[in-house]
Amino acid sequence: MSILERLWDLLGLVFGSTFERVGSLATSVFGSANARQVAKLQESADRITAMEPKFAAMSDEELRDQTVLFRKRLREGETLDDIMEEAFAVCREGGKRFLGMRHYDVQLIGGMVLHSGAIGEMVTGEGKTLVATLPAYLNALEAKGVHVITVNDYLARRDMEWMAPLYMNLGLTVDAIQSGMSTSEKQAAYQCDITYGTNNEFGFDYLRDNMRPAAKGDDRFPSEVQQCQGPLNYAIIDEVDNILIDEARTPLIISGPADLDLGRYGEADRVARQLKKEEHFTVDEKQHNVTLTDEGVRAAEELAGVESFYTAGNMEWPHLIDNALKAHYLYKLDVNYVVKDKQVVIVDEFTGRLMDGRQWSDGLHQAVEAKEGVPIKQETQTFATASLQNIFKMYKKLSGMTGTAMTEADEFWKIYKLDVVAIPTHRGLQRIEHPDLIYLTEKDKFKAIADDVERTHKWDVVVLKDGTEIWGNIKSETDSVVELLPKGEKQTESFSHEKIVAIERAGRPVLVGTVSIEKSERLSALLERRGIKHDVLNAKQHGREADIVSQAGRIGAVTIATNMAGRGTDIILGGNPETLAWSQLQHKYPTRLEVPDAEWKALVDEIDERENMSAEGKIVREIGGLYVLGTERHESRRIDLQLRGRCGRQGDPGGSRFFLSLEDDLMRIFAGDFVKSMMERMGMKEGEAIESSLVTRRIAAAQKKVEERNFEIRKSLLEYDEVMDEQRKRVYRYRQNLLDGHSSREMLLTLIHNEIQSQVETFLDPNYGVDTFSTFAGGKLGCQLDARDFQNMDFEMADTYAKDQAERASEVTVAEAVEENLPESMEDEWNWKAMATWANTHLGTNYQDHQLKNKDREEMIDELIAHAHKQIEETDLSEGEPLLEADYGLRVLCAWMRHKFGIETTPEEFRDVEDRRKVTEELNRRAEAAYTEKEAEYPVLTGISRFTDKQGAQVSLDREGLVDWVHGRFNHELSVDEVKLNRDDLKVQLIQYSKQTASASGGMHAQAAEKVEDLFGRADADVTASLASGQSGKLEALATWLQEELGNRNTAEDLSRMNRAELTLAVNGAVDDKFHPEMRRMERQILLNIVDDSWKNHLLTMDHLRSSVGLKGYAQMDPKVEYKREGMRLFESMWDSIGERVTDLIFRMESFNDDFIRSTWVDARTRHDDAHEAGRSAQQAAQMESNTAAQRAAAGSEGRAEGSVDTVRVEEPRIGRNAPCPCGSGKKYKSCCMRRDG
């Protein structure tokens, strides 16, 4: 580091501390904004407390009924803010009765902060889990869903089971989602008022839902293919900094196997092992990057056995070798990952947990697997992806809580628009934070840590007034004298209390926080050699986490833990009897909710008494509480604060200290030179330590620098993901609209209109003909031609001009080819063979290289130009003559309409129409009419296909079944004799019946719209049907009409919760289900499968774009800007292709696969069949077999390729064989519906 840099750092430290003091002085005089906000919330807390006697006097049933009353008030127009104080008072009373815990005032304040959609910073041990019940209960009253989000499955389940008695006794439902749950289990959990789960599980469920073929609750489809999650309404995030900041860098990806060669990873690993650091590549730990030098590239090319990495077929090598080098030099075993069961499992750098199922992307995971010699997993192709940042930003309201948020307040606001409010503690903080100790080497540091653990754990320490410390065991103590047996001595010594400053008792519990598995195991070995019994908590002992943590506060406990971030378990002084009780009962009961209260209380009391935990807790408090040691500073200050926060909870005593060395990663990379020069000036030697506030501030500055860098990384990720986020939202919104019942007909007609408008704009452009001719002529002549030059030319003029331009261009092309292969100034590099090959390929000659060698260079150029001119002159451009005719664009448009939609038009119809919009309107009208014809034809196709049986060459028609179906579907009487027509005549006849039935749908749609409008009147858009209807009876009348006229199953209660838009969709869907069920099902399947397939392919394209866009930087372009521009171009191209593919299929329904047509058939009596099979067959019809894996993944953990048929049972009296058929046909039952009923 230069002198100027050191001086700048020192100035920054000095001025920074000065400004901090000035800010603190101003705050002490005027008060902080945070304090004023808390004071305002305290007023609400006082009012809640005043209500306590009122609710305390209620019976359990009366208290439970408050939930019903609150919901009634909300339906009548009150808001959550209006009922907040009363709801909090009810929740507080519920906590007292059903949990044995009363919410403190500061917890009420925390609940208000969370309800407002902000982040509450609460010190560890202040009861965040209980705080979450307040806003969760309040917001669950709306019945729109509340998600409580934690960092792992264990905490999600534990917190749900712990708080469930409160929710359930207040009349709410609650459950937790867990990884590995079946689809039906998750649907049940999401159906609850409050759902607990992990950030990843909520995120992945969002992505899975957007791959499913049916909306939540759509009973036309099997439950396993329906969506689970529902709208994202309100989320409460525990450890919000860990989830929204640390985890935000990791995108969530659902992927499937890609067809790639795995052997290349082993080859790249072999090459990487032979390259030498510094000579062949450099490692930048600060930027987490490895870069090959020029010498390294040449060495790697030689080792890989290729001529150049930058020629076709070899361009993947640099990326493979970069990944292999990163695997060896940046990703370390037992730090970044572990090897478990011959698999590489990632270790979360912030929590120390194993992340089973996670993979590094872009081939890095495979590179690490090759390094470790374990089986290499297949690389994957993305089916769905999103960052946690963008998923959580979609919640209508978001809140969170953590012990450490203020350091990241700026980022929370900039990214999520979330304020941070620091909540005061219930009791004063008694934690003593000792200054850092800094050592020269890591070896010295670990020895000092082991000494400190031994001192605290094994020995009583007498501290004298002169600063001397004597370690030993106190044998006796009186008011005046202490008898101590010093360490290693056989004789006791006596010390007068007058000479003693302090006595530190042995057995104080110690928690040591490390940054990696490797460091925790190294320290464990040191303690074992000293005979100190201890527990190690890291990713390898994940299963014993609860047992270990529950004992960490007991007398004499020594616990080594990798990062405590996200652990979520309080360390209670003396031990936690409830954790031990559950560890005994978890094998007997599936959840804590199943444990009888009496058995639970008896076991907890028995453990507490047996283990003497309550008494131990008092002793531990007397000897100083939990002592926390940090083995090094984390790059994030929050992680250090979380480690410190493990002690001193709820006003308990405690202490913490960090031990550092110059060899620590943070010190070495960011602060090493500065601190090392200071220690050298102070004359420090190995084994010695310094305590310096200046060094501590320098370390804090280094941490802040890293945090700023990480923020920039996250911000960059967000900027890249913004492109995909907008595209994802557009695709998912389109898809969701389809699932939610938006008219698939209207969506298809929009695609048709867009296509027609696009083609009209293209074909009727005045320059379309000359543009086409210039492209055609340029391709034939092998040169670039400017379309503008051909305006107002006839064919002869255009032919002459084009060839003249081509001859001029050929002269330049020949000269360039000669200069490239036979450079005039470097005759020794002439390549006659390449020159001959070029001439033969481009000019149609038949030269051998020796023939050209015998020619003079200039003579050869003239001869090649002559060949080029001759070739151009002989080129026939007559095919392009029609392109220059005035009505060429109109003729192409008419041909396109005929080919695309089967609609006949002539240029004469539009030749005199100057306004292109009128052409578009007329073509749209004709396309809609053609589509209406298809709409009438398709049900007939499904019916004939359904009742036609093909056995080899034999084709038979079930006439009786068809007659029965025609009667039910079109309400038309038809005899068996009438269907003894040939298939084409029968089809024509049935289409007429279909048209008659379909014509009634328009009137029914109008009638439905009128009824909805009458029900809602002038009500606001968000008002529900029940509130709009009131006591008028209109809602019940609408439900009756839907049931009697359309056979719809929705009850008045089902409709009551819908607003105007939702009810409109429901009634229009009911009309379509009555009159066009087959067509709507077909449209839906075609749209879903083409959208899903196109999106999946687009994601792969965007993956490739993102990996290559960095090269734009070499061309002085901003890669992010280019990524956004090119990404949007690709997306619009994808969207256009969706329209083309869908409309191509819809207007060619006659050529659909028979299996697909049958899958969209709907029984006129029940309208239920195997919808999942319909989805599969639609894929066949659209020729999108590649999407099957994605759909299967979306169907849930069962991975079923086909769904089971819903059985519809109707209990009716048994009908005799010879009795009249109840359908009214006049036939006997055995000759009519008995066949159909089986």
Curated annotation (Swiss-Prot):
A Pfam family assignment: SecA_DEAD
CDD domains on file: DEXDc_SecA, SF2_C_secA
Protein name per Swiss-Prot or TrEMBL: Protein translocase subunit SecA 1
UniProt subunit comment: Monomer and homodimer. Part of the essential Sec protein translocation apparatus which comprises SecA, SecYEG and auxiliary proteins SecDF. Other proteins may also be involved.
Main location: membrane
SUPFAM superfamilies: Helical scaffold and wing domains of SecA, P-loop containing nucleoside triphosphate hydrolases, Pre-protein crosslinking domain of SecA
Signal peptide region: none
UniProt-listed InterPro entries: Helicase_ATP-bd, P-loop_NTPase, SEC_C_motif, SecA, SecA_CS, SecA_DEAD, SecA_motor_DEAD, SecA_preprotein_X-link_dom
UniProt KW keywords: ATP-binding, Cell inner membrane, Cell membrane, Cytoplasm, Membrane, Metal-binding, Nucleotide-binding, Protein transport, Translocase, Translocation, Transport, Zinc
Catalytic activity of the protein: ATP + H2O + cellular proteinSide 1 = ADP + phosphate + cellular proteinSide 2
Annotated binding of ATP, by residue: Q107, G125, E126, G127, K128, T129, D570
Function: Part of the Sec protein translocase complex. Interacts with the SecYEG preprotein conducting channel. Has a central role in coupling the hydrolysis of ATP to the transfer of proteins into and across the cell membrane, serving as an ATP-driven molecular motor driving the stepwise translocation of polypeptide chains across the membrane.
Binding positions for Zn(2+) per the UniProt entry: C1221, C1223, C1232, C1233
GO CC list: cell envelope Sec protein transport complex; cytoplasm; plasma membrane
Topological category with respect to the lipid bilayer: Peripheral membrane protein
Gene Ontology biological process terms, A to Z: intracellular protein transmembrane transport; protein import; protein targeting; protein transport by the Sec complex
Biological source species: Rhodopirellula baltica (strain DSM 10527 / NCIMB 13988 / SH1)
A molecular function GO annotation: protein-exporting ATPase activity
Cofactor: Zn(2+)
Compositional bias segments (type: Basic and acidic residues): 1199-1215
Subcellular localization: Cell inner membrane; Cytoplasm
Cofactor binding notes: May bind 1 zinc ion per subunit.
EC number: 7.4.2.8
Sequence segments annotated as region (Disordered): 1194-1220
Family, as annotated: Belongs to the SecA family.
